[in-house]
Amino acid sequence: MRDMGRSDIVISAVDALDIHIAMTSNACDKYPAKQHARRVAVKLGVSTGLVYLAGQPTVNWGDSDQPRPFRQRRYFYYLSGVDEADCYVTYDIRNDLLTLYVPDFDLHRAVWMGPTLTVEEARERYDVDQVRYYASLQGDVQRWVDKYNQSSPLYILHDTQRPRVSSNEVRFDDESLLPAMDATRGVKDEHEIRMIREANRISGLAHRRVLENIHRMSNEAEIEGLFLNTCISHRAKNQAYELIAGSGENAAVLHYVKNNEPLRGRQLVCLDAGAEWNCYASDVTRTFPLGTDWPSAEARHIYQLVEEMQEECIKRIQKGVRFIDLQVLAHVIAIEGLMRLGILRGGSVEEIRESGASTVFFPHGLGHHVGLEVHDVSAKDLRASDADRDYYNSVLTPSTSHGPCTLSAPALEEGMVVTVEPGIYFSRLALANARKLPYAKYIDFNEAEKYIPIGGVRIEDDILVTSSGYENLTTAPKGEAMLEIIRRGIDN
């Protein structure tokens, strides 16, 4: 691996300007935890009860004195906005009282790790009604149980997260809270949208930096290193998911994360990487050549096909649309394009779609929700009719069992953020397996194998559903703008 020293990195005028912007625009208002708590109560459909949520505790690796990297539990964060370990939150629905519990002061820990959050600091920082130390938690919950629990349930996410109380007849409800919170989390408020937008802005800068410097790189690891460096230097220390930097045939591996192979002799790189900002994810994929233009007709044709799939699906996003219908559209466009290239043949577009042959090349869902998780949660709706199920089964694969592509998913709503990430891949394993399946008659395997060296192409943006249509939150360059950045990087 070449040393990516300071002198090797190109800093564009856009990045230089951004440094000033980042320093002056990151003072955000409080996370709207109280608003979220009230929304959850509405979804629960009750006027009494106590919501109890535990944050992520400090945990060491097995057989080690070293702590695991901290990652806050997202349901807890949604009702608190607190990204600190060993905290708890309760919401008394009857009294509209949101209470945060922070760790008791520990002198030994403070000396070694720095002081923990005080109740005074927490009151100033977070949108809660009161803050107390952990020592008060058990007694506070016990008093609520003694006063209200005969008529009101104590809501928990899972049976394993029960608080310690002395009564054996506590009315725990571990079935209602999760779906209520999923329903509220599926639609983002303005604060959440700002966080996702900022995560996308930083991810866009990192993708741009990779494009500017790709001609200097000799290994996938250098791509990963520069992307992470750019995000961290913009104060986005955490990635929303493990970075994927697959070159050549590795681009056909959907979740390739080794990122350690040489780039020499390969055509394309599929870079699927997104920063996290204040616990909110971005999810961005770009596929680009290891040169100033597409290295082969095959690479250009597949990129243009995936580009068409994405553009046609994005422009149809609006509230009321069922995402599964966009999934079908993406497959239809893919089939038409692969038929033009001679890869699919021997039937009509509808016959090939119904056979499932297109899933050999497009094996995943068109997208998913984005929020506190990169594959975020959402409400569920009644399942489609059997007739609908028969129609859609040909484009539903195991990877589409969750998210907006499922038959059970509701129509898109204003405030949802979803990815649109079509892809076309040429996997040796998938093609070998397809030879044994009934739809093999629709595939020209000799023609398909000519495309194996390109690996695959995926393009992914994060799309906000608005009152009038959609807004693309992703700023990473793609298409001709992407190629121009690569060319300018070489010129510099």
From Swiss-Prot:
The EC class name is hydrolase
Source taxon at top rank = Eukaryota
What does the record give as EC number? 3.4.11.9
Q: Where does Mn(2+) 2 bind?
A: 272, 283, 460
Kindly state which keywords UniProt assigns to this record, in alphabetical order: Aminopeptidase, Hydrolase, Manganese, Metal-binding, Metalloprotease, Protease
Q: Where are the transmembrane segments?
A: none
Asked if the keyword 4Fe-4S belongs to this entry, the reply reads no
Q: Which GO terms describe its molecular function?
A: manganese ion binding; metalloaminopeptidase activity
A GO BP term here is:
proteolysis
Which reaction is the catalytic activity of this chain?
Release of any N-terminal amino acid, including proline, that is linked to proline, even from a dipeptide or tripeptide
Q: Do the record's keywords include Protease?
A: yes
**InterPro entries associated with the record:** Aminopep_P_N, Creatin/AminoP/Spt16_N, Creatinase/aminopeptidase-like, Pept_M24, Peptidase_M24B_aminopep-P_CS, X-Pro_dipept-like
How, per the record, is the cofactor bound?
Binds 2 manganese ions per subunit.
Q: Disulfide bonds, which pairs?
A: none
Binding sites annotated in the UniProt record for Mn(2+) 1: 283, 421, 460
Question: Which cofactors does it use?
Answer: Mn(2+)
Question: Which Pfam families does the UniProt record give?
Answer: AMP_N (PF05195), Peptidase_M24 (PF00557)
> What's this protein's function?
Catalyzes the removal of a penultimate prolyl residue from the N-termini of peptides.
Which family does the UniProt entry place this protein in? Belongs to the peptidase M24B family.
Name-wise, this protein is Probable Xaa-Pro aminopeptidase ACLA_020440
Q: Which source organism?
A: Aspergillus clavatus (strain ATCC 1007 / CBS 513.65 / DSM 816 / NCTC 3887 / NRRL 1 / QM 1276 / 107)
